[in-house]
């Protein structure tokens, strides 16, 4: 006989609870950390050659998708990236002539027990997204062994049928090397490291030599890692040299408009000029004009930029809020990306604004210290020595480049009078004079 007493009820309840718990654990076992995530156990796994690599950060750049079956030109697609229990998603992108331009970059972490990177493509529907296809990328054989390749194509399959290809790039960056003080410029560091890594044929030769000597692929990559050396070199630079290096990250093509109307956009090449402690983010019709600072369409002073905003409604648009010198009115610069992720542009400009403000603060402190030092010197030095210093400075200023330039200008004005033949005959070659004058033709109003 089965009696309904308290002991039996407790026994049944505990059995039911245990079965529910085991079911939850089985379903969500990926969410639980692997035993190798413990450092000593992880090192033991590496020594026993069970795992081929340590945990590392990877930057995955999704360039575009080539579709074999493109029936609808207005169809939108989204890409899901999955490594273990970590996910990353792109925005929705339109298909045009069986091609989906994405150009988005995702930063992900690969744990040492992760073996595959899964790429899934979904087509946007009215109520629910429909599965289009997927690609399984083996991390060790297709990424680590190939030394983190760029612009590599992977087949997207659906029910053992190839439905398209995905173009991806992989970058290995040791983000742990960046110190706490420099973490506000992380996006600037990442951009410079990636730009160097794109032309790293010599570094690949070093890695191949180490592999031939008997080292594992990941250990060879880690030993010849450029990110730590580049970061050390940049951090040792003076702030002005650091700015000159980071200026290159703000150069590139963008679509520009003065109004919030998404139809009327002009394609310009944006280029950052840095001189006399001022930052001019100029835009030109062509890249060749930017380097020579010719035919400038307009510019924005980065010192007067208040903030950078991402457009809520579209993933390709962003705008900059800024003020002009001696003006209270707020102006907006509406921009659209072409070949770079919108978030990358926003992060770079945001970090650069912080860098500019820090530079200005440092410069102000230096000026204050010099002034304080001069005031102390004047108090200590006698009047006779001060008068000698004044006369010396006047004589040096007379022989300065500025006065030489003005003399040349006067010469040209005199030589323009054709009636005076003596001056005209003794003129010589006026080419260098006009060359010096043409340097200041493109002046800035502020």
From Swiss-Prot:
**Source organism phylogeny:** Eukaryota, Sar, Alveolata, Apicomplexa, Aconoidasida
- Please give the chief subcellular localization of this protein: membrane
Which residue ranges does the record assign to the PH domain? 252-363
Q: Where in the cell is it found?
A: Cytoplasmic vesicle, Secretory vesicle, Rhoptry membrane
Listed under GO cellular component are: cytoplasmic vesicle; rhoptry membrane
Protein name as annotated: Rhoptry surface protein CERLI1
Q: How does it sit in the membrane?
A: Peripheral membrane protein
Comment on protein domains: The C2 domain is a non-calcium binding domain. Cooperates with the PH domain in the binding to phosphatidic acid (PA) and phosphatidylinositol 4,5-bisphosphate (PIP2). The PH domain cooperates with the C2 domain in the binding to phosphatidic acid (PA) and phosphatidylinositol 4,5-bisphosphate (PIP2).
Deletion phenotype: Conditional knockout at the ring stage has no effect on parasite development during the first cycle and merozoites egress normally from host erythrocytes. However, these merozoites are unable to reinvade new erythrocytes. Impaired rhoptry secretion during merozoite invasion of host erythrocytes. Increases the spatial segregation between rhoptry neck protein RON4 and bulb protein RAP1, and impairs RAP1 processing. No effect on rhoptry morphology. Microneme secretion is not affected.
State the protein's purpose.
Answer: Essential for merozoite invasion of host cells by controlling rhoptry secretion. Binds to phosphatidic acid (PA) and phosphatidylinositol 4,5-bisphosphate (PIP2) lipids and thus, likely contributes to the assembly of the machinery that docks or primes the rhoptry to the parasite cell membrane prior to the fusion with the host cell membrane.
* Alphabetized UniProt keyword annotations: Cytoplasmic vesicle, Membrane
InterPro entries assigned to the protein according to its UniProt record, in alphabetical order: PH_CERLI1
Coiled coil feature spans: none
* Source taxon at top rank: Eukaryota
User: Which residue numbers delimit the C2 domain?
Assistant: 39-208
